[in-house]
Amino acid sequence: MINEFPEEYDNLDIDISIKHVVEGALASKLSGYFLIQNNKFSFSAVAFGRIGGHNINVKISKTTGDKIRKLNLDPEIVILIVQRKIIEGDITIQTKKQ
């Protein structure tokens, strides 16, 4: 697969954790966080998949975007990477302890 992200993002380590999922008939709502350089960033998302395959729409707050910019990263590119990782299953799903 061709990487469409700028070269400086090739070695960016992003760990994604899903904390909460609400499943629906057509879409699921997710919330969680991702870690970049020991910085924790919260997000919400809507995941769906029908004709055309799976898709996800990740949202972050303006404040979160500003914090990502302070790391000299483009929040739009970070969101695209997070979305791709979620679709590819490169995530941790947190479960409630019994």
Located regions from the model:
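Short, cysteine-centered beta-strand-loop-beta hairpins and adjacent loop/turn segments enriched
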Residues: 26, 35-46
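Negatively charged, low-complexity tracts enriched in Asp/Glu with abundant Ser/Thr
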Residues: 1-33
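Acidic, low-complexity intrinsically disordered segments
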Residues: 2-8, 13, 42-98
